[in-house]
């Protein structure tokens, strides 16, 4: 098997200036002239104080960020970022998992996508990985409970090892861990580097003496420049050559960190021989290649749907809350509007009932907002690494919520419909259930879209509340279309409430189209004042609009799903840039 050596040639990175700012200000460099080399079976530790540029350098080495100048080479060949990501793995500082899945289930999901043609080997691969990471005894433990910080970090490392990368990059793998857990993590990384003959590069703030014994080479950074790059056991000699003697009570690295600001000349490693440019014959095609996924779309959707169902089933509290909420609210409304009749008072009450129904159904979906926001970093990590297609995630999410929200719609509709005494027709009832179902699906898509945009739960909740209030205000229930200022008229047509309210009104009064709802009685003369058709005419509605409103609601459902996909696609592309 071919072994790889990773190197960089004069990498610099400057913080991009805003194109909107017309200024002659020079760019601020975070990294300057970084030239390094990392060999297989060795750990290279990037060490430096906060703000030295460690994380930025790792992002560049992982091909997540493009350097301002310089190049990354693998066996002296300029890398193609897309191809390079297939043989490398990046482990971020913060662990992100689904807390309701077990360690084994988390590994099995990724392994099934990475080994679609060898599904029989998945269990053996997972078992072997659990053993290698000393996690066998925690295989059936849920990630949200019972795992220490060090064990969670090992799970993150395990996920990155499933496709057996040649280069493993880790951002602060010991951050937030106690000394023993930190040592255990680095010890496992050392074992991986030697047993698999892989390149391991990690950033670390200030390693302990025990951890230093596991590190082969160090790259000491200060203010974005290299102070020293080489073997750890040669650091003391380097310091001596600069006129610094290491005190007996300190090791060479501790002393180097203390006098970092006094080592004025950045270290230049004369032993690293890198070409200024790669010969054309050795250059890889720099054009971004199409990402080829290891699993088919059907396999991806199937596995993602299975994971979604498992998480929903295990979120029993939310599941039962949604079902009970729909049942209780439906029954309470049914008893409040019990047999409301069809007269003048009944017409007014129906408007109120339908308006409240829409408010309840659309606002209740905000319960899923924190779940979607918590899932987002996991989704970005998995899709940016090429584990599965983003579109497969959106489709699987849709397929799972279709039957789940249909159940909610049926429970709410049946508990309400007959108590209120709405139009008794199986066709009308079926249409009512259909509209309620599409409303909750549309609301789910709306929340999904906002969760892709919102930076956090508080901002997401505020956005949902403000926009739903605006949609309700411009629905025509409070202010008619004719009374709206022309410059606000567009909001009337963008209001989700409008089409949903119109659909419910048309369904009810089409059924009562020829029935007299309000009579004029004087002496022996009885004449009909208002029919169901008159109610529709007064509100500018017609029976032929019945399916138009359904199509509009479906359009909103699809639109918000597509917008969510585009926002997430932009985020995924940003994490690969």
Curated annotation (Swiss-Prot):
The keyword Nucleotide-binding applies. Pfam families: ABC2_membrane, ABC2_membrane_7, ABC_tran. The chain crosses the membrane at residues 318-338, 353-373, 400-420, 429-449, 458-478, 487-507, 548-568. It is a multi-pass membrane protein. One of its GO terms (cellular component) is membrane. It is found in: Membrane. Residues 6-248 form the ABC transporter domain. It comes from the Eukaryota. GO terms for molecular function: ABC-type transporter activity; ATP binding; ATP hydrolysis activity. ATP binds at residues 48-55. Residues 299-509 form the ABC transmembrane type-2 domain. InterPro entries: AAA+_ATPase, ABC2_TM, ABC_transporter-like_ATP-bd, ABC_transporter-like_CS, ABCG_dom, ABCG_transporters, P-loop_NTPase. Keywords: ATP-binding, Membrane, Nucleotide-binding, Transmembrane, Transmembrane helix, Transport. PANTHER family: ABC TRANSPORTER G FAMILY MEMBER 28, ABC TRANSPORTER G FAMILY MEMBER 4. Belongs to the ABC transporter superfamily. ABCG family. Eye pigment precursor importer (TC 3.A.1.204) subfamily. This is ABC transporter G family member 4. The gene is ABCG4.
